Amino acid sequence: MPDRNIVVLTAPSGAGKTTIAHRVLEAMPDMQFSVSATTRAARPDETDGVDYHFLSPEEFRARIDAGDLLEYEEVYPDQFYGTLRSEVEDRAEDGPVLLDIDVKGALNVKRIFGDDALILFVAPPSLDELQRRLEGRGTEDRESLQDRLDRVEQEMDRADDCDAVVVNDDLDPAVEETLTRIRQFLSS
């Protein structure tokens, strides 16, 4: 696998990492997106194999047992997220790869790939703004929204373990900062 071509965006849910990831992919056509696997139900606008690889909990556990996952986490009972090793390794042969994963997974990727991976933490401008964004999605019931908010503090505490922090208080400058950091990393 070529050196220095793995880029990871990580953030608490609602910080804007997926939006930034889409903008990065638009601006850098040679960058490939690593599609994560999950056991959660697909949202109405999501496509299997494009947004996520949607697996049953049994299928996901079989992939864990087979060593097919680079990283994974059981976020809630029977709700797994993870990165298929083949997604990263196969795509990295053809050029830089972008991952959009949670903080724990991002730090595991860094542990495995070291300086060949750039980990960028996308931070919300404030916790109040993050809560507003999550509520605005309308995809969560009160209990799951509160669960997500409870995790935010733990995730924010890990920001300094990442290579850099990009504060997403205004999307366009956050995208530009992200692109600058990625281009510097890929050219070094």
UniProtKB/Swiss-Prot annotation:
Query: Mind listing the UniProt keywords for this protein, alphabetically?
Result: ATP-binding, Cytoplasm, Kinase, Nucleotide-binding, Transferase
The reply to whether Transferase figures as a keyword in the UniProt entry is: yes
Enumerate the subcellular locations listed in this protein's record, separating them with semicolons. Cytoplasm
One GO molecular-function entry: ATP binding
For the ligand (ATP), the binding residues are 11-18
Which GO cellular component terms are attached? Answer: cytosol
The answer to whether UniProt assigns keyword Amino-acid biosynthesis to this entry is: no
Reactions accelerated catalytically: GMP + ATP = GDP + ADP
Describe the location of the Guanylate kinase-like domain by residue ranges.
4-183
Its primary localisation, in coarse terms, equals cytoplasm
The UniProt record lists the EC number as: 2.7.4.8
Q: Which InterPro entries match?
A: GK/Ca_channel_bsu (IPR008145), Guanylate_kin-like_dom (IPR008144), Guanylate_kinase (IPR017665), Guanylate_kinase_CS (IPR020590), P-loop_NTPase (IPR027417)
Q: Which SMART domains match?
A: GuKc (SM00072)
Identify the enzyme class: transferase
Name the job this protein performs.
Essential for recycling GMP and indirectly, cGMP.
Per the record, the similarity remark reads:
Belongs to the guanylate kinase family.
The protein's name:
Guanylate kinase
Q: Which organism is it from?
A: Salinibacter ruber (strain DSM 13855 / M31)
Q: What high-level taxonomic lineage is stated for the organism?
A: Bacteria, Pseudomonadati, Rhodothermota, Rhodothermia, Rhodothermales
